[in-house]
């Protein structure tokens, strides 16, 4: 299945000059959602993944069903103040500033094999921060998997030697 046929493009959102890739049409279509999950699972099934890590919020949409299909656990990555208990944090750069993400300190055990699953690879700043969190917790990042990659933003270049897959690619 061509997943691009299920993703709506909205020009001028959230501001003029942006071509927004709206995944709500894909996740609202049972066939499209199943196909995207199946594609992630097919790619990750031989990587011996212990955990799927997903950044809020759309990483949850794809990460949980992928974890379930692989028999792996799921670790949510949240903005500060959203997780109870002891957390570890990372600051990361955005195009116009910086932000912070957290995971529970005990959510990843030393040596666990982790795939990070998210909806979008743009500049790579968010996933680079998530990968640092995983590694700080003792995990080994074995793959970074995305529904959409905006290739003109060169996020893949920022991610060095990580194994990166995207199910669809768009020019900006």
Curated annotation (Swiss-Prot):
Which terms in the GO cellular component ontology are assigned? Answer: cytoplasm
Q: What does this protein do?
A: Catalyzes a salvage reaction resulting in the formation of AMP, that is energically less costly than de novo synthesis.
Q: What InterPro entries does the record tag this protein with?
A: Ade_phspho_trans, PRibTrfase_dom, PRTase-like, UPRTase/APRTase
Q: What is this protein called?
A: Adenine phosphoribosyltransferase
The answer, when asked if Transcription is one of the entry's keywords, is no
CDD domains membership: PRTases_typeI (cd06223)
Which HAMAP family does the UniProt record give? Answer: Aden_phosphoribosyltr
Pathway of this protein? Purine metabolism; AMP biosynthesis via salvage pathway; AMP from adenine: step 1/1
MF (Gene Ontology)? adenine binding; adenine phosphoribosyltransferase activity; AMP binding
Q: Please state the gene responsible for encoding this protein.
A: apt
């Amino acid at each position: 299945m061509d997943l691009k046929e299920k993703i709506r493009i909205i020009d001028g959102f959230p501001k003029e000059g942006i071509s927004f890739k709206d995944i709500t049409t894909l996740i609202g279509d049972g066939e499209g959602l199943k196909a995207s999950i199946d594609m992630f699972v097919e790619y990750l099934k031989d990587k011996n993944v212990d955990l799927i890590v997903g950044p809020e919020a759309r990483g949850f949409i794809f990460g949980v069903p992928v974890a379930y299909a692989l028999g792996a656990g799921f670790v949510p990555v949240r903005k500060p103040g959203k997780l109870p208990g002891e957390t570890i944090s990372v600051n990361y750069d955005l195009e116009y500033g910086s932000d912070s993400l957290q995971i529970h300190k005990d959510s990843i055990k030393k040596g666990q094999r982790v795939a990070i699953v998210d909806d979008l690879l743009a500049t790579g700043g968010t996933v680079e921060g998530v990968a640092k969190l995983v590694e700080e917790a003792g995990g080994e990042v074995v793959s970074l998997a995305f529904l959409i990659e905006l290739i003109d933003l060169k996020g893949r270049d920022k991610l060095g030697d990580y194994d990166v897959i995207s199910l669809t690619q768009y020019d900006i």
